[in-house]
Amino acid sequence: MRYADIQVETERLRLRPFEMGDAEDWFKIMSSPEVTRYWSHLPWQSLQEAQEDIIQDITHMERKEYLRLAVIDKATNALMGMCVFFNHYPNSRRGEIGYCLDTAYQGRGIMKEAMVAFITYLQTHLSVRRLEADIHPDNKASATLLMKLGFEQEGYLKQRWIVGDEISDSIIFGLLLPSKVE
C-alpha cells in the first residue's frame, strides 16, 4: 500500500497524510512555543516553513522513508496534531515514533487515542515488533502518555540535542510488540 493512501480511523479521529491545504493550520501548531518547547527545532516563523515541510513530507512518504499522519477531528475536520513513524529498520522490524498536539486539544485523551490506532496500524501493516521514542526529560506529559501506552524507560542520553541555544538530554522509551496497546 502507498503511504499516501493510508487512512486510520477511531471513534473521534481520522489519521491521514498531510495535504497542502493543511499548511496554515500546521503552521499555527508548529509556530507555538508551547507545542515546540520539547521539539527538535524552534517554533516556525513563516507559513512557508509549513508548506515546505508538507512538500518534503509528501516526497518522503512516496519513498516510504517515514510515515507521518495528520490527526484530524472527525466532527470538525480540524487539524489537531500529528503522529510519525521514522528511522524504520524493516529487517529488524523496529522504528521510532513521535507526535505533537495543538495546545487547544491537550488533556482530552486525544493523543492516546491517536497513538493506539497508529501503533496498531504499524504492528498490523508494517509488522513492527519494537518502537522507540526519544523525549526531553522535562516533558512529563509525553512520558505519562508513553507509559500509558506500555512503553518503558530504557535509557538516558546526556546532551543529545541542541535546539537554539539550549543543549538538552533525552530519555529513551521502548515498547516491545505484540503487546496489545490500549
Regions found by a protein language model. Give the residues of each.
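Short loop/turn motifs at secondary-structure junctions and domain boundaries
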Residues: T59-K64, F151
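A generic secondary-structure signal
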Residues: Q56-H60, Y121
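A short hydrophobic/aromatic micro-motif that marks alpha-helical segments and, especially, helix-coil
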Residues: S46-Q48, M61, K180
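Conserved GNAT-fold acetyl-CoA-binding loop/helix
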Residues: E34-Q56, L67
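Acyl-donor (CoA/ACP) binding surface of acyl/acetyltransferases
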Residues: M1-P33, R37, I72-E182
